[in-house]
Amino acid sequence: MRTAVATFGFGRPDFFERMLRSLGTCLEVSNGTVDVFHFLDGGPGSEQDALRAVIEASGVPYASIVARPENLGVGRQLIGARRELLDVEGYDRMVLIEDDIELNSTYLTSLLNLSDWAETYADVGTVQVWNVEAGSKQSLQPYLHQVELTNRHFVTYCLTKRVWDIIKPVLYTYEKKFLMRRPYTKRPHYRIRRFMRQQLKHAPKTPQNPRLDPPSQAIHNPFPSVPWRTAPTSQDAITSLAMYLAGLHRITTRVSHAYYYGETGVHCTPEVYDLMGFNDQGWWQWDAAPERFEIRYKDSNGSWLSSYYR
């Protein structure tokens, strides 16, 4: 499939450089199998010139730098990138990479292999090979081929045109109603939560066969409730909601091929980072990418795995 890789930058050139350096170790980037697009948000604090300098100095091949003339905010920036690459440019799938994730050299090979595998199932949505799984390298090595359902953060993932076409009506409605003509940080949280509650009144759809069709005990609503004061209202939350309502499952490898280092940022502090379990990440370097995959729904004790949106 024709594949685009989208990176996202706003300030923090040191973060962006660390991410970009790791992206350059992926074979698909160096041999031109994928096209890399750098989306740089604008406005005060954007440091676009510094980010451009990082990109040019890195030597990592790229197709285009998309520098926004104003500050779109995270929501419009991510929705816009998906629109431009999947709707306008016609890519079959895209990989989204934020500026605070470090990739193993096996990252893209593993992710695209998983995407190919997942495309045989009509009820799989996004796929990712970043996860939080504690354990030593020796203890995790046997499980590189295992995948599981997830509701974790959308730090980096692969989205196909097929899935985007299914979920984009909800995202475009959210964008039009709540993100235009105002800063993303001042989006109307209560109105968005009302929108989410209205959406959740609809039962999830059932995609046609063939399906992965997980047992009901393994499936968890990312938003079993929408508290008025605390429910997340980000575009990531709406993306997760849209996939749930479409009957699409998010999946991840059990063992991670990337490391999230965003301890400080727009939505994160060291305390939140620890609360989310990110300190339990292992950062192991793998020599080979899995070529076959096996879904697991239970842990080693026979208990159902669970994952909630966080």
Ranges and model annotations:
Residues M1-I97, I101-R310:
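Peripheral/terminal regions associated with large enzymatic or DNA-binding modules
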